[in-house]
């Protein structure tokens, strides 16, 4: 572990210890709390700059849209990727962009926090129960109704998927609203959604067609990841060989490259690269299945509504696994490569 990573780990532990009780003084909501309140202005707080974490917020935004169709939603995010992700969400009114490096942008960082205090909201939702800054910002914001994000015991008893990072905020919101006498909501949870336009889908198809130069459906792989989530070249070489043996006659097999322009299969497959998140999504949306280790691009594929196979070297697929549209998470310390191939076959049936 690098010194920087060690410092960040210690910082998170200290901040979590300091802020874990923030919001504990708020009592359970009751129907009295919503008297004379019409929920029109909502603030969702998710101060994380990573692509995957921002994409994992899209189901919560959809849930708020569906529950309060006429509301305006402000987002408190970190970095600039949220602007691309929520570009086609008409309900988004404003995105507060917290700088990724606060100590290099102290004034902007402070102004973002101060701006939260200046505006009144009807409802504030902390999108990450483990975010210290999220809890502090939720506490700081002006609103009669606040969801801090703690997973209540009754949710844990009722839902076996409550651990998932994009699902529990929705379960929390539904529980909170039921306490306010809103109708009980047991509808299917929203999936990650980039809301690609027809033009973006058409452009993605054109790029894919130019790469493949045939009409066969496409399997796309992404071989990069961070730390111990990243599989070795030997692992990917073996897996790529199995993909070719089982699918090459009927499917194109291509690789999406990361910004580092590296390939764990040594560029043996036709490949493409893009810096544009929405263009990447448009290309992926035209493929039959997307295969990747646990990373932000895996969530991007899921948000493009493409069946996504997430390869997990850690046992945390219940928290981060792709879901919906036939997607699944495979724990590769339990599943063999051949079992992974069979799972892909089942998706493509």
Language model: regions and residue ranges:
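Positively charged, low-complexity intrinsically disordered leader regions
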Residues: 1-39
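Conserved nucleotide-diphosphate donor binding/catalytic pocket of glycan-assembly enzymes
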Residues: 2-7, 96-193, 215-222, 315-318
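Nucleotide-sugar donor-binding patch of glycosyltransferase catalytic domains
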Residues: 2-4, 148-149, 271, 299-349
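Active-site donor-nucleotide binding/catalytic segment of nucleotide-sugar enzymes
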Residues: 41, 45-47, 191, 195-262, ...
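Short amphipathic alpha-helix
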Residues: 54-64, 81, 239
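Short internal beta-strands
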Residues: 73-79, 253-257
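Conserved nucleotide-sugar phosphate-binding/catalytic loop shared by glycosyltransferases and other
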Residues: 75-106, 330
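Donor-binding and catalytic core of enzymes assembling or modifying cell-surface/extracellular glycoconjugates
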Residues: 231-317
């Amino acid at each position: 572990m690098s010194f920087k990573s060690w410092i960040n780990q210690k910082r998170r532990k200290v901040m979590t210890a300091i802020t874990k009780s923030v919001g504990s003084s708020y009592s359970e909501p009751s129907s009295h709390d919503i008297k004379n309140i019409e929920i029109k202005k909502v603030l969702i707080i998710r101060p994380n700059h990573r692509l995957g974490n921002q994409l994992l917020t899209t189901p919560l935004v959809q849930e708020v849209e569906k529950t309060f169709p006429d509301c305006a939603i402000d987002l408190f995010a970190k970095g600039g990727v949220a602007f691309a992700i929520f570009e086609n969400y008409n309900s988004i009114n404003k995105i507060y962009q917290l700088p990724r490096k606060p100590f290099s942008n102290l004034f902007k960082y402070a102004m973002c926090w101060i701006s939260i205090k200046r505006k009144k909201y009807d409802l504030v939702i902390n999108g990450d129960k483990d975010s210290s800054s999220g809890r502090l910002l939720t506490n700081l914001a002006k609103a009669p109704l606040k969801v801090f994000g703690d997973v209540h015991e009754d949710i844990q008893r009722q839902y076996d998927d409550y651990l998932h990072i994009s699902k529990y905020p929705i379960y929390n919101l539904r529980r909170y609203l039921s306490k306010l006498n809103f109708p009980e909501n047991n509808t299917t949870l929203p999936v990650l959604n980039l809301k690609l336009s027809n033009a973006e889908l058409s452009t993605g198809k054109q790029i894919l067609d130019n790469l493949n130069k045939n009409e066969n459906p496409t399997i796309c792989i992404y071989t990069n990841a961070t730390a111990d989530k990243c599989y070795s070249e030997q692992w990917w070489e073996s897996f790529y060989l199995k993909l070719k043996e089982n699918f090459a006659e009927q499917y194109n097999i291509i690789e999406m490259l990361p910004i580092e322009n590296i390939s764990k299969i040594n560029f043996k497959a036709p490949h493409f690269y893009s810096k544009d998140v929405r263009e990447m999504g448009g290309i992926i949306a035209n493929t039959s299945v997307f295969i990747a280790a646990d990373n932000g691009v895996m969530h991007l594929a899921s948000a493009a509504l493409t069946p996504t196979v997430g390869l997990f070297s850690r046992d945390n697929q219940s928290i981060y696994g792709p879901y919906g549209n036939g997607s699944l998470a495979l724990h590769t310390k339990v599943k063999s490569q051949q079992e992974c191939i069979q799972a892909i076959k089942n998706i493509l049936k």
